[in-house]
């Protein structure tokens, strides 16, 4: 029982009753199972310090002992309460994460000799049995329940983020047009609208805020260079310039198609 005698020696000056000696043993058993003592009371305190020793004023209330613990890996926190009842003590332990509760009732006369509480070798009796009961009644149930909860809810795994996250509001870069569209760049400021019309070599974007040629939606295959009566020569319309076709849509070298529904008297020159 390494460490128990050292702990007892540090706490012996404050021991005045068998309950104190039993709580000292309880504290030692909890610490040897991977915990640090934090402090007294139900609620955390700014002055809490992790220690293997009993905290200050740990036995100020002989009727109700309340001690808080934290596991060395920080995963579990315990609240231990020991209530004095006649010639025994009821031990209650709460694990905050799982809300698991374990309790144990001990008879003081079975494990504590109250004749001389200053002598470590005389104070405790049946120490192995006491240690076994604490482990089976408090430590093991708390740890088993915590492991069960941890294994039933494994941590979620997220795939690594891609270089470009999918934005559901982004307009698709796929264009159903047969011709390749120039790269669209937004104006640097609202006052830049139409600025490309002043640049004879500007071929990166149009001058309109809403450009029907770059809207991202399907459009009719209208040739913007069509003129009257024939097509304009190549280069007549600067790339990216605002241009409204001024000739019949769909003209071809063979000439326009005849009207399929001529108006009445269309061939009467005197009409």
From Swiss-Prot:
Coiled coil: none annotated. It holds the Pfam family PI31_Prot_N. It is found in: Cytoplasm; Endoplasmic reticulum. It comes from the Eukaryota. GO terms for cellular component: cytosol; endoplasmic reticulum; perinuclear region of cytoplasm; proteasome complex. Monomer and homodimer. Interacts with FBXO7. Belongs to the proteasome inhibitor PI31 family. This is Proteasome inhibitor PI31 subunit.
């Amino acid at each position: 029982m390494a460490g128990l005698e050292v702990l007892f020696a540090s706490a012996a000056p404050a021991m005045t009753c068998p309950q104190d000696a039993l709580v000292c043993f309880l504290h030692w058993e909890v610490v040897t199972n991977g915990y640090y003592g934090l402090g007294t009371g139900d609620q955390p305190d700014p002055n809490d310090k992790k220690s293997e020793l009993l905290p200050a004023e740990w036995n100020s209330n002989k009727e109700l002992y309340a001690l808080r613990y934290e596991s060395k890996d920080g995963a579990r926190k315990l609240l231990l309460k020991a209530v004095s009842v006649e010639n025994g003590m009821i031990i209650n332990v709460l694990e905050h994460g799982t809300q698991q509760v374990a309790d144990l009732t001990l008879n003081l006369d079975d494990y504590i000799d109250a004749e001389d509480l200053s002598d470590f070798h005389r104070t405790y009796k049946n120490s192995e049995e006491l240690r076994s009961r604490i482990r089976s009644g408090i430590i093991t149930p708390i740890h088993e329940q915590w492991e069960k909860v941890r294994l039933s809810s494994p941590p979620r795994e997220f795939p690594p983020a891609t270089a470009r996250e999918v934005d559901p509001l982004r307009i698709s870069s796929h264009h159903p047009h047969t011709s390749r569209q120039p790269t669209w760049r937004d104006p640097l400021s609202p006052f830049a609208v139409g600025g490309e019309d002043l640049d004879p070599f500007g071929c990166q974007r149009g001058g309109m805020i809403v450009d029907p040629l770059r809207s991202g939606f399907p459009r009719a295959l209208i040739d913007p260079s069509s003129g009257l009566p024939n097509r304009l020569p190549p280069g007549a319309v600067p790339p990216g310039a605002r241009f409204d076709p001024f000739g019949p849509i769909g003209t071809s070298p063979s000439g326009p198609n005849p009207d399929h529904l001529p108006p009445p008297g269309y061939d009467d020159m005197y009409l």
